[in-house]
């Protein structure tokens, strides 16, 4: 099962996409099951909250997961109220077509009325930044050690690489105030 999951993730950008293509798996049931996880290890991130609050820019969540999963993560981090459901573009909004597909990116841009040339696109999966770069975004990869996350991390579609999101948000805020 783990091998199948990994293979589908690599080939189809999400395990769900592969399961839908090859096994007609209902996406809502899969997402509910796979996102039923213990998040008690996560703590409120007061530094990130402060930086998000002080950064005078619109902020959105663009996820290959469900909106409910994003809500759970953001709630555990203590920042959900800074976004809310209306600031989340999830896999259901994408018609279950995952990032980095152009169609999905374009739907997200349309939903939020974003101008990609005025957008900073931050991702933990490097290859997902490719379409943002093509559309004109400043792309930022949040460095991590996950094998799939760092695939394509050496490509030129990545404008910046960061290790600390809160510090990066602070740097953006300080640059904007100059």
Model-derived features: where do they sit?
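Short, contiguous strand/loop micro-motifs
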Residues: 2-4, 35-39, 57, 92, ...
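A short, Lys/Arg-enriched amphipathic alpha-helix followed by its capping loop at the start of a domain
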Residues: 50-59
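Residues at structural and domain junctions
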Residues: 5, 16, 38, 60, ...
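N-terminal helical cap/lid subdomain that shapes the substrate entry/recognition surface
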Residues: 1-50, 68-71
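Asp-based, Mg2+/Mn2+-dependent phosphohydrolase catalytic module
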Residues: 28, 53, 66-67, 71-178
